[in-house]
Amino acid sequence: MKLQKPKGTQDILPAESAKWQYVEGFAREIFKRYNYAEVRTPIFEHYEVISRSVGDTTDIVTKEMYDFYDKGDRHITLRPEGTAPVVRSYVENKLFAPEVQKPSKFYYMGPMFRYERPQAGRLRQFHQIGVECFGSSNPATDVETIAMAAHFLKEIGIQGVKLHLNTLGNPESRAAYRQALIDYLTPLKETLSKDSQRRLEENPLRVLDSKEKEDKVAVENAPSILDFLDEESQTHFDAVRQMLENLGVDYIIDTNMVRGLDYYNHTIFEFITEIEGNDLTVCAGGRYDGLVAYFGGPETAGFGFGLGVERLLLILEKQGVALPIENALDVYIAVLGDGANVKALELVQALRQQGFKAERDYLNRKLKAQFKSADVFAAKTLITLGESEVESGQVTVKNNQTREEVQVSLETISQNFSEIFEKLGFYTQ
């Protein structure tokens, strides 16, 4: 048997992992500006944490979850999304307590798992970056969170992004709309896809965002949620729209957008961009005011979003956006002869302890091969260390770009390489 990675997974190799680290670091920097702190939850949860919150009839639960019984006969699932685990953690750790500052703002990063047909930007193990804000029903929280997502996408370089906005209203408005949708779709049931015929019975709002051609035709003249909003829901949505306009955030009202999770109410949104003629959602989220109470906590408002790292990187690549990845070595030490082996090890370690990114040769190769390695690593400076340099205590440090050279002592390199580095035209942080 040939041992390979499971279908729908990937190995993120060093050339790619640098991009991942950049995206994750960039997200952390943006989130910190908005006073978010990181939370890390287990990658597996009790089955009910996901099924009851995401919705028993959703595609995620009925078709896509990886679930199993462990050796203690506990029903476990690999997390398919990030919000439910964070809410579970919020309640379990009593972060709703009076002494905890409100609103409570958290972000998370990590792998999620869904049994889907693998395709570009969508894998069975995928990685999500997300945020959750607890304790504020103020529509300004909706807008701040959406604006933070827009801020991140703009700063990282995603082009042509459009914000699609909708509301699901409060439970009363949603229930009224649900019935109106059932009344509209029931006579058309036989024209719907098999999945949407099932959805009509279980979760009729999901028919609205079906990608099947026959379903799109069926919902063309469907009633709009906007016609079923009560005063509270209308006031909240109007405030969100007005504040987005005040911040200069453009949006498109998309009444067919419902999101694939049952816990949403009021504001929902997606950031969408077009790649090769296809609309791709790069970030999505919304408000979920009933989820904390559903997990046994007090009535607590919530708002958040998630974005897929694989899809984000795919879009950046397709749009030709080069991330500013700094992979260059500061110093490469070419080693000539066994007599220089120990000193080279001491020297490269001293450089690293001074904060420089340094490497040396370990393979006793010819100098030409070592110089080629220095070029492959894009080394800024090059030191050639042989037995004669060890004996004299003097060595040549070369600017590997301009070929400028300086003669210095090994002691100076070991103790204060910054001075030499700057003399050769480079700057230390």
UniProtKB/Swiss-Prot annotation:
Any GO BP annotation: histidyl-tRNA aminoacylation
Q: Which organism is it from?
A: Streptococcus pneumoniae (strain ATCC BAA-255 / R6)
The GO terms this record gives for MF are: ATP binding; catalytic activity, acting on a protein; histidine-tRNA ligase activity; transferase activity
**What domain of life is recorded for the organism?**
Bacteria
Which cellular compartments is it found in?
Cytoplasm
- Alphabetical keyword list: Aminoacyl-tRNA synthetase, ATP-binding, Cytoplasm, Ligase, Nucleotide-binding, Protein biosynthesis
| Protein name per the record | Histidine--tRNA ligase
Main EC class of this protein? Answer: ligase
Q: What is its EC number?
A: 6.1.1.21
Primary subcellular site in the record, as a coarse category: cytoplasm
